[in-house]
Amino acid sequence: MQREYDYIIIGAGSAGNVLAARLTEDPGVTVLLLEAGGPDYRVDFRTQMPAALAFPLQGRRYNWAYETEPEPYMDNRRMECGRGKGLGGSSLINGMCYIRGNALDFDHWAKRPGLEDWSYRDVLPYFRKAETRDIGANDYHGGDGPVSVATPKNDNNVLFHAMVEAGVQAGYPRTGDLNGYQQEGFGPMDRTVTPRGRRASTARGYLDMAKPRDGLHIVTHATTDRILFAGKRAIGVHYLVGNSSEGIDAHARREVLVCAGAIASPQLLQRSGVGAPDLLRALDVQLVHDLPGVGQNLQDHLEVYIQYACTKPVSLYPALQWWNQPAIGAQWLFAGTGTGASNQFEAGGFIRTREEFDWPNIQYHFLPVAINYNGSNAVKEHGFQAHVGSMRTPSRGRVHAKSRDPRQHPSILFNYQSTDQDWQEFRDAIRITREIIAQPALDAYRGREISPSADCKTDAELDAFVRSRAETAYHPSCSCAMGTDAMAVVDGQGRVHGMEGLRVIDASIMPRIITGNLNATTIMIAEKIADRVRGRTPLPRSTADYYIAGDAPVRG
């Protein structure tokens, strides 16, 4: 087998597959793509049917199933930290919500030294490059990219429309496109689903395009043990295949690109000798480069479910009954339509809870059934719910490798809810959600409040609910942050500070978490840096306008 390549990419996920596809567009370029998981089996409904999104989180075939250390502000719970395993990475198991973040997230990044070319108008062309939206291209959306994006249709569940209307009746804006001119407000939510109703992972969109090329070599079930260095230059990787303890060395003529995600990328750097000296010493790892920010600055989104009974039989509750599922599956399999062809997150929104926030600090996902994200604790009656959570928590966590063993999970601590702002935002969010659900648009459907229940009212009671019931939104990020400060890990092109031939390109390099789901932005990051790796001129900046709230009230 060939053992030398131009580039070695570690992780065939949301970013790694983008890079594999783009780098091999250049004639003669060779790429080794290593993935610790297996293939994205197209016959497996668990990963291919949008409505089955909870199934991959319930096992370990497609999910690393990490757990945090006891979270000190969350009743010392060990909390889920699911990450994708297999071709497609987390795009193979995520909720398929196509949300890019707010324009001001990127303008905020661009205010940091060294990140001036990460403003919204700089990154928008790369969002467009990646996307094919089913209703066509415009100034904000692409029409010929590898990622299929589906828009909600008017004949979808009536509860989606009622919940959006309720948000507007409560005084918040209406927006027709959460990824367009104005994110703030309530409206339809796009999703990464193909026209045939299949999950649009990066394995389907990017790898299918790249697999026929002679320059791309993909190895699945390949766990990267460590990066190999000659001095400060990355020259290759040492990896294990399957359960074997016999390692294989592969060498990179140009660069090693780490795309293992916000948990595994810092863990791999630490095991390879790049990180904080005290940690590496404790692991008995030889120091290659002192970089204290590796694994620090870890951020995530936390959310709660506000659940209600539905007084009319219009929810998706019947779809949870086993006797209805064969027909749903058949319609999806043969026609690519019906309940199975949607992730059922087709409406949502973003609001500011207080005037002090310049752009939205709270996100909503509306769901026409009452159930946990991972498929557990389904309410045994017709119901609906709002997922609500804060977007830019001041809390910061960390990822630490526990040993040199590449198969041992790292120590993860998010420090969820460690600041007063965190608690205030969740109290506000729950109370505002109740106001929204109380609007006339939902009078025909609103039953009793199931969770947390109407008698949960005081600050102390709401805080107790959040401590015991809040869950991750599965958005870990920022643990190898871009920047030039002492705790930055990479520069604005993903190059690891103080090293040569080594980049990190995935959600870990976000300097600050964005306002929304992470998959679309992770793909954009990879598209943008791919041009840098290839030595190409960046795409021209967009001239599209975007909404800035300014002095506008949070409610009209």
Curated annotation (Swiss-Prot):
Which cofactor does the UniProt annotation name? FAD
* Residues spanning the membrane: none
Q: Which InterPro entries match?
A: BetA (IPR011533), FAD/NAD-bd_sf (IPR036188), GMC_OxRdtase (IPR012132), GMC_OxRdtase_N (IPR000172), GMC_OxRtase_C (IPR007867)
The record's listing under PROSITE patterns reads: GMC_OXRED_1 (PS00623), GMC_OXRED_2 (PS00624)
Q: Which GO terms describe its cellular component?
A: membrane
Q: Which residues bind FAD?
A: 6-35
Tell me which residues this entry annotates as catalytic.
475 (proton acceptor)
Q: What class of enzyme is it?
A: oxidoreductase
List the molecular function annotations (GO) for this entry.
betaine-aldehyde dehydrogenase (NAD+) activity; choline dehydrogenase activity; flavin adenine dinucleotide binding
- Gene Ontology BP, a term: glycine betaine biosynthetic process from choline
Catalyses which reaction(s): choline + A = betaine aldehyde + AH2; betaine aldehyde + NAD(+) + H2O = glycine betaine + NADH + 2 H(+)
List UniProt keywords, sorted A-Z: FAD, Flavoprotein, NAD, Oxidoreductase
Q: What is this enzyme's EC?
A: 1.1.99.1, 1.2.1.8
Pathway(s) it belongs to: Amine and polyamine biosynthesis; betaine biosynthesis via choline pathway; betaine aldehyde from choline (cytochrome c reductase route): step 1/1
A Pfam family matched in the record: GMC_oxred_C
Q: What does this protein do?
A: Involved in the biosynthesis of the osmoprotectant glycine betaine. Catalyzes the oxidation of choline to betaine aldehyde and betaine aldehyde to glycine betaine at the same rate.
Q: Which family does it belong to?
A: Belongs to the GMC oxidoreductase family.
| NCBIfam families (alphabetical) | betA, PRK02106.1
In Swiss-Prot or TrEMBL terms, this protein is called Oxygen-dependent choline dehydrogenase
Q: Which organism is it from?
A: Xanthomonas axonopodis pv. citri (strain 306)
